[in-house]
């Protein structure tokens, strides 16, 4: 996998993980405050977004108290939908690395068909059979470490 692709996947993962954390914390807040009004939920979500930003993004990007992670309005009408996105980025990178090992286009096509035929499995079971490893952030973190050194 080339460095640009790795960085693109990593950045997408980093970005959506923040929104996913806001989603999870917002739902925890809502369950703890079942009689909250829409305005109270809005204010809580903005506060949560700022907290997540300050903990995970401000040290890297420098801006303090950014509410931008609260921008996904569908986190309210599609509960716990956003936390699934990071898994997609993690799996994407593991598959990219796996396919990069194919010697030629035929090997790639054969491997793609093998993986497609695995059927409906849980994500981790699918990955074990597809690439021989659990779903893990280790491959992308190791690749990022290699790139930035």
Regions found by a protein language model. Name each.
Residues 1-8:
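Conserved active-site neighborhood of enzyme catalytic/cofactor-binding cores
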